[in-house]
């Protein structure tokens, strides 16, 4: 359980890659008002596991990452990809670790790393509990750290290699009913990212066609279509109103 893991790491001795020693401190538990405010923002019920964890702490007072919190850090955009994103950690450089909270969900895993440079979404961990364990397992800038591996290796691999994406034509002929239904509504130049069963190394370059990449999600399924943005008219076309 997440609550038990949080209790077990309180006061844990952490040594960074420069040899500096700190001891992990937890923030106080959530107040009743904080719980009510949180529940008012959610698309569904607050999972029992998260409620129990919030009775232990709302996050880390210090620690390897810039921040880790069980109360949504907010600040993350990309609503077309994640209608109900829940930010639980931040690296201090505009990148977040988020949960894809779905209406009616009783389990808030997995954790995704949402990076803006490169513009990639990457699978990080199967659950918040595993993510917490990974945070304290090794300094985030240590090559052995699962956090470092995604932060420094996986995102660049996903940015340069799009072989896991499915062409619309192939998806439209797939025996997978959900994938096929999604493809039927997409233009032929679309490619689809499928993170319904994410594994280490999974993800997609949400900005593969630049900052104006068109992102379309298939309901609450973890399926996203990426297409090129409409071409901007050239100078003479704008000049003569073409």
Question: Residue locations for each model-derived region?
Answer:
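Charged, low-complexity intrinsically disordered regions
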Residues: 156-158
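Compact, glycine/acidic-enriched structural inserts
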Residues: 109-146
């Amino acid at each position: 359980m997440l609550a038990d893991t949080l209790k077990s790491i309180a006061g844990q001795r952490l040594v960074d890659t420069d040899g500096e020693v700190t001891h992990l401190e937890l923030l106080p538990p959530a107040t009743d008002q904080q719980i009510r405010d949180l529940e008012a923002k959610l698309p569904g019920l607050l999972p029992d596991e998260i409620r129990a964890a919030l009775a232990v702490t709302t996050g880390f007072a210090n620690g390897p990452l810039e921040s880790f919190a069980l109360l949504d850090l907010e600040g993350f955009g990309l609503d077309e990809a994640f209608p109900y994103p829940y930010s639980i950690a931040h690296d201090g450089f505009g990148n977040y670790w988020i949960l894809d909270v779905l209406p009616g969900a009783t389990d808030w895993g997995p954790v995704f790393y949402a990076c803006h440079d490169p513009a990639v979404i990457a699978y990080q961990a199967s659950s918040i509990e595993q993510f917490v364990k990974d945070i304290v397992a090794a300094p985030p800038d240590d090559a052995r750290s699962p956090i470092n591996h995604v932060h420094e290796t996986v995102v660049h691999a996903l940015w340069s290699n799009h072989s896991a994406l499915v062409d619309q034509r192939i998806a439209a002929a797939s025996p997978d009913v959900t994938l096929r239904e999604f493809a039927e509504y997409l233009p032929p130049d679309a490619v689809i990212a499928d993170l319904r069963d994410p594994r280490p190394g999974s993800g997609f370059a949400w900005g593969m066609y630049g900052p104006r990449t068109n992102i379309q999600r298939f309901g609450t399924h973890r399926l996203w279509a990426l297409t090129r943005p409409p071409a901007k008219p050239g100078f003479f076309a704008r000049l003569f109103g073409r």
